[in-house]
Design a protein with these regions (language model features):
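A short core secondary-structure module
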Residues: 4-48
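A short, charged helix-loop
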Residues: 61-89
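Flexible, small-/acidic-enriched active-site or ligand-binding loops
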Residues: 41-71
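Short, glycine- and charge-enriched coil/turn segments that flank and shape catalytic ligand pockets
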Residues: 27-33, 71-79, 158-163
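Residue-level signal for inorganic ion chemistry
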Residues: 5, 38, 63-65, 105, ...
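Alpha-helical interface subdomain recognition
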Residues: 1, 88-231
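A generic structural signal for well-ordered coil/turn residues at beta-strand boundaries
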Residues: 15-17, 31-34, 43, 59-64, ...
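Solvent-exposed alpha-helices and their adjacent loops that cap or buttress functional pockets
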Residues: 1-2, 11-15, 27-32, 53-58, ...
């Protein structure tokens, strides 16, 4: 086999000594069948890694393949059956990312509550203002709803339930919506300090933004959820 093409935004792609590459070995471009996986050395002839950072500081790379020769011995799994393996791994990865995102949401809520207890305006702590208390209750509820969906998705995937994929899609939709709500409120309630490098609020927000776009954003997972649930 000879691989040509490019894989973009590969996490730690420039640091790996081997990469598993999906390539079409049969079928049409949009077919699920016909995708095969190959284990390719990162230093193989024709492989180029273009390294860069995302806005949250994570290192990724674009991997360019030009006439990269691979043998049948380098194939992972059955010929043309790679799509199912990819889907399985991505579901597990989405759970891991959601757990990380949930931890960030918890920290943003906790740090915001603590800040409003110490930041004073008009001679009193801003956390005593009922309007701000309501907003912090809303973000707490958003966090709890996301946590419940994470637990549900973990159970569904672990038990190989029929609706496991639907549960993961629902989780990613909630993570996107609740995450945006929580980091937006955290930044606003911290004021201008919320976007400075001195505080970790902005760093958490940027990481949460990247988590919410990795392996599909909320709109993508909403469409996938609808297709599985209602079609």
């Amino acid at each position: 086999y000879v691989i040509n093409g490019e894989k973009v935004v590969v996490a730690n792609g420039a640091n790996a000594d081997h990469v598993i590459v999906s390539a079409r070995t049969s079928g049409e471009q949009s077919d699920e069948a016909g995708i095969s996986l190959f284990l390719v050395p990162a230093d193989a002839a024709g492989v180029e890694a273009i390294d860069y950072r995302l806005m949250d500081g994570q290192r990724v790379a674009n991997l360019v393949f030009k006439d990269v020769a691979v043998s049948a011995d380098q194939r992972v799994g059955e010929l043309g059956a790679g799509f199912g393996l990819i889907e399985s791994v991505v579901q597990q990865a989405n759970l891991a990312l959601a757990a990380e995102g949930l931890g960030i949401m918890q920290q943003l809520n906790a740090k915001t509550v603590e800040y409003t207890r110490t930041r004073e305006q008009f001679g009193v702590a801003i956390g005593s203002f009922q309007a701000l208390q309501h907003r912090m209750v809303e973000t707490f509820m958003a966090y709890e709803q996301t946590k419940s969906l994470l637990y549900r998705a973990v159970c569904a995937l672990t038990d190989e339930q029929e609706d496991a994929a639907t549960a993961v899609h629902a989780l990613k939709v909630m993570l996107d919506r609740a995450g945006r709500q929580i980091y937006s409120e955290a930044i606003q309630l911290h004021g201008g300090m919320g976007i400075t490098d001195e505080l970790d609020i902005g760093h958490y927000a940027k990481r949460l933004m990247m988590i919410n776009t990795t392996f599909g954003n909320g709109d993508y997972h909403q469409a996938q959820f609808n297709a599985l649930r209602y079609n």
